[in-house]
């Protein structure tokens, strides 16, 4: 791909053993498998990777394992989110040191930062010099990177090159393109991918390629080539599954989807508990529908 943040980047799940320690061998194998199945890169230590419940040593090793397992040309873009800029900067420095091509950065966590504070946060981490994907997730961070704020960041923080847009508002891409034209827009939620792809996107940071990489890549390639006649029914078959990516239970759901196709999803760490049985059954049914589409077409 042209840049490390282009194409389909899988926000990877962290594989925990039954004792909730990390299985780094399984993670390395998963990174290699995603590359073999045509995706363009991985994002360790994102929201899906449960970065909030990893120790500092675990978080560092996840990035190091991903970089070591990635074949040539396969991108590793670690999440570097933290409560404050000092810690985020530390993780950005580590990512740069071990060979990552870019990082993904949320606004300050758990604090309703003002626009000026958000801007200061990005400026501090940008001092590292590595390209930054800003990540808008107002549901988890209490901060909304509005198009006007994105424009300020674009004007004042040159190292911010793109934004992962997870607000769910499909109209925002047009506002961002108008107000911050140099910022590349990356789809941040699986269940609005096709809608946003019509507006000209630079990539897709996705959850369900953890379970459905070939299927997700086929959809992506159809959409970016403008073949919506074929992409639309495929997206419809996938959409019930994809919608879990926008629910608070998305980590458990995606890990269950991985288990469904014979991959290793495994458990989550507290505070996340296993899903109720009726929700597990629903995900299995929806995975069956998605897989049947590709089998029977």
Ranges and model annotations:
Residues 21, 53, 57, 112, ...:
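Charge-dense, low-complexity intrinsically disordered segments
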Residues 10, 44, 49-52, 82, ...:
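Short, flexible micro-motifs
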Residues 4, 9-15, 33, 37-39, ...:
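C-terminal alpha-helical cap/extension of soluble enzyme domains
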Residues 74-75, 133, 161, 184, ...:
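Secondary-structure boundary/capping signal
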Residues 128, 139-248:
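Catalytic alpha/beta core domains of metabolic enzymes, predominantly
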Residues 2-142, 152, 258, 297:
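Active-site beta->alpha loop and helix N-cap motifs at the rims of alpha/beta catalytic domains
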Residues 15-18, 53-56, 147, 194, ...:
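Generic structural "secondary-structure junction" signal
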Residues 23-26, 30, 58, 62, ...:
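General structural feature for long, well-ordered alpha-helical segments within catalytic domains
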């Amino acid at each position: 791909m042209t840049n490390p943040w282009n194409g389909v980047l899988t926000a990877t799940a962290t594989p925990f053993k039954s004792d909730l320690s990390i299985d780094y061998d399984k993670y390395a194998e998963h990174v290699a498998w995603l590359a073999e199945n045509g995706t363009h890169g991985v994002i360790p230590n994102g929201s899906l990777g449960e970065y909030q419940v990893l120790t500092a040593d675990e978080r560092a090793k996840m990035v190091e394992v991903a970089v070591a397992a990635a074949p040539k040309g396969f991108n590793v873009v670690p999440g570097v989110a933290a409560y404050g800029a000092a810690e985020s900067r530390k993780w950005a420095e580590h990512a740069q040191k071990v060979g990552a091509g870019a990082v993904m950065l949320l606004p300050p966590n758990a604090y309703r930062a003002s626009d000026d504070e958000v801007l200061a946060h990005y400026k501090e981490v940008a001092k590292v010099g590595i390209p930054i994907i800003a990540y808008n997730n107002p549901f988890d961070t209490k901060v909304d990177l509005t198009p006007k704020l994105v424009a300020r960041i674009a004007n004042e923080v040159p190292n911010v090159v793109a934004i992962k847009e997870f607000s769910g508002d499909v109209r925002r891409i047009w506002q961002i393109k108008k107000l911050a034209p140099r910022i590349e827009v990356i789809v941040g939620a699986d269940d609005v991918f096709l809608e946003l792809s019509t507006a000209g996107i630079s990539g897709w940071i996705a959850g369900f390629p953890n379970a459905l990489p070939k299927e997700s890549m086929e959809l992506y390639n159809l959409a970016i080539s403008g073949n919506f006649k074929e992409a639309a029914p495929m997206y419809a078959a996938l959409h019930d599954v994809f919608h879990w990516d926008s629910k608070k239970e998305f980590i458990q759901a995606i890990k269950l989807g991985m288990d469904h196709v014979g991959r290793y999803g495994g458990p989550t760490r507290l505070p996340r508990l296993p899903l109720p049985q009726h929700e597990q059954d629903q995900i299995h049914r929806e995975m069956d529908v998605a897989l049947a589409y590709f089998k029977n077409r």
